Amino acid sequence: IRRQRQMCIRDRYQKKTVRKMILKDHKRPDGRAIDQIRPLAAEVDLIPRVHGSAMFTRGQTQICDVVTLAPLSEVQKIDGLDENVTTKRYMHQYNFPSYSVGETKPSRGPGRREIGHGALAERALLPVLPSVEEFPYAIRAVSETFESNGSTSMASTCASCMSLMAAGVPIKKMVAGISCGLVTGETDDDYLVLTDIQGLEDFFGDMDFKVTGTHDGITAIQMDIKIHGLTRPIVEEAIARTREARVYIMDEVMSKAIAEPRKEVNQWAPKIEQITIDPNKIGDVVGQKGKTINEIIARTGVKIDITDDGAVSVCGTDKEAIAKAIDMIKIITTDFKEGQIFTGTVVSIKEFGAFIEFAPGKEGMVHISKIAKERIEHVEDVLTLGDVVKVVCLGKDKMGRISFSIKDVPADQK
């Protein structure tokens, strides 16, 4: 008990002394001026194999952020109170391991700090993210706290912004974040606003005012105060101070690491192409019990997502495979016209002709009289199962089946 009392007395004296030095003498614990930012450093592409990575350091606070891109089918499913919000396309996760503050303890599930800081950094970037039409990806950013001495959420905002740009996400503008503190005296006019507070100033101070934004405006604000309220001059000064600090961070540090988003996504990231089809043709692409779409996936190795309005996203790491899958989908959804030329495979031979599969789940028939220029007695004399042939569309017969001809294919198309 005696030791606890001694600690309480020491903490009260320390708090009183620190606040007095800041308020009266304008001396901060680390010797900085009231509007001075701690030493900064920024770097991108730390981890070579990930889709995007960045490191942001502010004094004794250091964050490493990693961005992962995925097709839209990988968006986070939300089961919350708002029935209108069922998915989340951009996810920012913040981790605060014990070693970042020199401690050792079990690493359990996310706590209030992890959830709150992650949500703040996530909201900070939402206004500048591209639309789904511009960038059809699900985006996940993970911020790992390597070292912590105040404002890790603001460092996470800076690191995740650079990581997104390094990953090739076409964000509209660069975003940075900074935190301001406050020490108050006996009267409303007796106060001092501090730029870029560290842990001790946060602990002994009266406010933690976090602001994120671009050169042109604010994207997110979070304020924690230990007093009953703030006057208008305090708020105005804090906002002005954070803007000045944000601009400095972006111009002098972040822009020198990466000035603008990469033109293309990382070579290891999945490539996504989008096309739009007639919603009435979705059933043709999917096929009975998914047979057609699964056949396309098996042949090309891509991933295909289709929405109810006919938007088709094809995702894969090989551009040629993506193009091949899109060609198959276009063939399946095409209203066949006389004279169109296709490449197909002989999948069935009958006495009267052969069936040619020219797209997954799509077949047409070549009558025996349309196989060769000369008369043939048996289809097998010219064709065998598995042969790849060029065919020209003759339209549809009375039963609605597609009719092909091999012999009428123009010579320059063979």
Task: For every predicted segment, state its role.
Residues 44-67, 149-170, 283-293:
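Conserved phosphate/anionic-ligand binding catalytic regions in large, soluble enzymes, centered on
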